[in-house]
Amino acid sequence: MRNTDRKMWFFLGSGDIILINFAFVLAYFLKFDTIELKENYIFLLLVFNFSWILVSAMFSLYTFSRVDHLEHIVSNTIKAGVTHALIITALLFSIKASEQFSRQLILYTYIIDFIVVILWRFVALAFIKRYRVSGYNYRRVV
């Protein structure tokens, strides 16, 4: 992995994780009128984060070339989001924990998450494109 790929992974990956956590806490607030998470919901949030990391690695969300079209990047992000939702649903039903968690909270989380992650991708890719056009990504060779 090149140094620039690691920076890109950190930049986009940390943004995704922060937004997933934001979406979860906002959905929790909308459902329960508090941001103080119960212990079982903290566990669910950790599962959300770890499964997103695995899904993003499966779909190579953080490695793209300069010629990738925005539609391709967004479609991969949507596919990863759907796969993430399927993994979370399967996991909750397999451990018989689906009764412990609010389905409305999970639905709110995914609605908010899809919106903010797609917007984040647009903003981040526009920033990266502007950064590259400005010439800051060139290495100085002596």
Task: Give, region by region, the residue ranges found by the protein language model.
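Signature of alpha-helical transmembrane segments in polytopic membrane proteins
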Residues: M1-N137
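Conserved hydrophobic helix-helix packing surfaces used for dimerization/oligomerization
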Residues: V141-V142
